[in-house]
A protein has these predicted regions:
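Short, flexible, solvent-exposed loop/turn segments with mixed acidic/basic and small polar residues
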Residues: 1, 62-64
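Vicinal oxygen chelate
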Residues: 1-3, 7-17, 45-49, 64-123
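Core segments of cupin and vicinal oxygen chelate
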Residues: 5-6, 12-54
């Protein structure tokens, strides 16, 4: 018997406010591909896409503690310096561009409003 193929993987992260998350990830070029809204009008879930990258976010009733999140999203961009400048211009607290041995063209780190860590590196 052969194992059925898995086509892709999409991270699903819990957040306190889906609408706030959409606004934040818009700064990175993500757009809404799909969403679910509760009867009261509150966004409960969203699927965001940017190029071939997909992320899903779902509202949680549990406390979301910034800085305590355990996942790290590694995003690839064509121009790290331009993305760094763009995010700073939009009020995102980004770390400095660094050039570790595994990313000689540079990368930088920051966090989203719920504390999920992100790294942007060159493609």
């Amino acid at each position: 018997m052969t194992t059925p193929a898995i086509r892709s993987q999409v991270p699903l992260l819990h957040v306190a406010d889906v609408a706030r998350t959409i606004r934040f990830y818009d700064r990175l070029g993500f757009v809404v591909a799909n969403s679910v809204t509760a009867n009261d009008g509150t966004l409960q879930w969203v699927w965001l896409v940017a190029g071939s990258t997909s992320l899903m976010f779902a509202r949680t009733e549990e406390p979301v503690v910034p800085g305590a999140q355990r996942a790290l999203l590694y995003l690839y961009a064509d121009d790290v310096a331009a993305m760094h400048a763009h995010l700073r211009a939009h009020g995102v607290d980004v770390g400095p561009i660094q050039t570790p041995f595994y990313s000689p063209r540079g990368e930088f780190r920051f966090a989203d409003p719920d504390g999920w860590g992100l790294i942007v590196a060159h493609t």
